[in-house]
Regions:
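Hydrophobic alpha-helical segments, chiefly the membrane-spanning helices
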Residues: 1-319
Length: 319
């Protein structure tokens, strides 16, 4: 009975986490829609908000060892589950030249930074700061490539904007679907919704981390294992659903922008910000399983980028 209660709290907390991220991101994008780089930053942060909130809640609750499993697990799931399901559904999933030449190296570079930062067993403040700076550089780079001067929250899920700013925009479109359709109609309402989203995010993340620890205790297993597996699968579900909707519209080229940029943002931003609050221990499980799996996933995806397509058979192999 205790396990059921913890799992119920965990499920409700994750749902609230996504809702809070939608509200906060919609409000932030409304206030920052005049500047392309600032707007892209808001979109990128919005895409990583669930993982970022969970990571900060883990650090502030005295469980920094959960941060890297959260990041690694969600990143591995984002690559294997999202790409696998998308390729299997699309039969042949194309990878456009921009992804292969710009976004694939971006992901590989992000993975290299994380690997070397975690090599000594702890990710320190200075390494976290480096990751945040790298994230900002990525934002400016992708914003410059998109050549977007201004946009509104509604433009975030509009086809024309997606085509121009695929790198960061599609990760939010995939995660939150049409969540921005209900954005605030005026500044006051946007501010209130943003504040409510921030509060909901904070509370949901705290309850999710506590429920994760409680469920792990009830099952007599390590919380790190649940963070790497259950959180990973849960985090990948919205991306899978969003990617399948994109494939149904036959806009196959947008899926890979979701995966490449979304995973890079997740690695740099979430790990970097969390490390600036507290040193992040890598842990035996993360070092022996998480990092090698993550490196293999990134390497496989990068190699697939050179072939410019992922076949249905490769998709099933990913799964």
């Amino acid at each position: 009975m205790e396990l059921f209660i913890w799992l119920l709290i965990f499920a409700v907390s994750l749902a609230a986490l996504l809702i809070g991220a939608v509200w906060f991101s919609a409000a932030a994008s409304r206030f920052l829609n005049k500047a392309a780089a600032a707007g892209f930053a808001a979109i990128a942060v919005g895409a990583a908000l669930p993982e970022l909130a969970l990571a900060l809640a883990a650090v502030l609750s005295g469980r920094p060892e959960l941060v890297l499993p959260i990041v690694l697990g969600s990143s591995v799931a984002n690559i294997f589950l999202v790409v696998g399901a998308s390729a299997a559904a699309a039969k042949n999933l194309p990878i456009v030249r921009e992804c292969a030449e710009a976004e694939a190296p971006l992901l590989a570079g992000s993975a290299a930074i994380l690997w070397f930062s975690a090599a000594d067993g702890i990710v320190f403040f200075e390494e976290g700061l480096l990751m945040v700076v790298a994230f900002l550089v990525c934002v400016v780079f992708l914003a410059a490539r998109g050549r977007i001067n201004r946009f509104t929250p509604r433009d975030i899920v509009a086809p024309g904007f997606l085509a121009a700013g695929r790198g960061l925009v599609e990760i939010v479109g995939a995660r939150f679907g049409r969540g921005f359709d209900g954005h605030a109609k005026n500044t006051a309402r946007a501010l209130l919704r943003g504040m409510a989203g921030a509060v909901l995010l904070a509370l949901a993340a705290i309850f999710a981390v506590e429920a994760l620890a409680g469920a792990a205790t009830a099952m007599a297993i390590s919380p790190v294992l649940l963070a790497f597996s259950v959180l990973a699968a849960t985090a990948a579900l919205p991306e899978i659903w969003g990617s399948l909707k994109i494939i149904a519209k036959k806009r196959y080229e947008l899926v890979m922008g979701n995966v490449f940029s979304g995973t890079a943002v997740n690695v740099l931003l979430v790990t970097g910000v969390a490390a600036m609050f507290s040193p992040l221990p890598v842990g035996a499980s993360a070092a022996a399983v998480g990092l090698p799996f993550f490196a293999a996933a990134v390497a496989l995806l990068t190699v697939s980028g050179f072939s410019r397509k992922i076949s249905s058979g490769q998709g099933w192999l990913y799964l």
